[in-house]
A protein has these predicted regions:
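Extracytoplasmic/secreted envelope proteins and their assembly/folding machinery
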Residues: 37, 41, 45, 58-62, ...
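Conserved active-site neighborhood of the chymotrypsin/trypsin-like protease fold
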Residues: 79-82, 93-174, 252
């Protein structure tokens, strides 16, 4: 006659056990600690330390222009001796047109270009503008994924703006330097070409022989000028802080279309 009371007694016993277990757990559990401002600052600091820094402006600009920069090399004979020159250029059209400085190619009978993907090609000089020291080359062999550079009006430049130069100084291919616009509307007789160039962009990003014909970029990696010359009072071809670039706005007659 007592069997009908066994289940309720067992259930009640289980409930009591659970309640006691919860009371013991709450008694033994450490009380939560209040976060201080220092705790929050330390947590934020640890998070920032584990977050990689964003790429630099020069890095972003270089990645934008990298597929469009070429090595320009010439071969010629002077006084019975083989002579070669090396400079830079920038692709301005999908058809393989390349903008560079005229003094880079001169009157050399053989001009070769090396694209970013390693494609090498002979090139023809299709446009010569000696009064601006500019030339346009046409490559005979093109990469499958040729990417022209984006041109931007140099009229938007201001003194103090950051600029980036890409070229091949002393044959060190695809070197990147950055600096600022030091002056606008400069006039200079280029030692390389002997031509008096006007309306030049003066900048202090390091350039040396091999940079000529390469692009001068804004922060977005757009071409605002073509590196043309450097000034050194000692008549040595090494950089001392003064470089000159031809504004991209002044290249319209060479490239056949205005910049963006």
């Amino acid at each position: 006659m007592y069997t009908r009371y066994r289940v309720p007694i067992l259930v009640g016993s289980n409930i009591l056990t659970i309640v006691l277990a919860l009371l013991i757990y709450n008694a033994l559990r450490p009380a939560p600690q209040n976060l201080t401002q220092r705790d929050i600052d330390n947590a934020v600091s640890r998070s920032l330390q584990n977050t990689p820094p964003p790429p630099s402006t020069a890095s972003v600009a270089y990645e934008a222009i990298r597929p469009s920069v070429v090595v320009v090399q010439t071969q010629s004979t002077e006084a019975g001796k083989a002579r070669s020159t090396l400079g830079a250029g920038v692709v301005i059209a999908e058809t393989g047109l390349i903008l560079t400085c005229l003094h880079v190619v001169g009157d050399a009978p053989q001009v070769k270009v090396l694209f970013a993907d390693g494609t090498e090609s002979d090139a023809l000089v299709t446009v010569r503008l000696p009064e601006k020291d500019l030339a346009v080359l046409s490559a005979l062999k093109l990469p499958d994924d040729l990417q022209p550079a984006t041109l931007a009006s140099s009229a938007s430049l201001h003194v103090g703006d950051e600029v980036i130069a890409v070229g091949n100084p002393f044959g060190v291919i695809n070197s990147v330097t950055d600096g600022v616009v030091s002056g606008l509307g400069r006039q200079y007789v280029s030692r390389e070409s002997g031509v008096e160039l006007t309306n030049l962009i003066q900048f202090d990003a390091a350039v040396n022989p091999g940079n000529s014909g390469g692009p001068l970029l804004n922060r977005a990696g757009e071409v605002v000028g073509i590196v043309a010359s450097l000034l050194n009072p000692t008549s040595q071809d090494v950089f001392i802080g003064i470089g000159f670039a031809i504004p991209i706005d002044d290249t319209g007659s060479a490239i056949g279309f205005p910049p963006v």
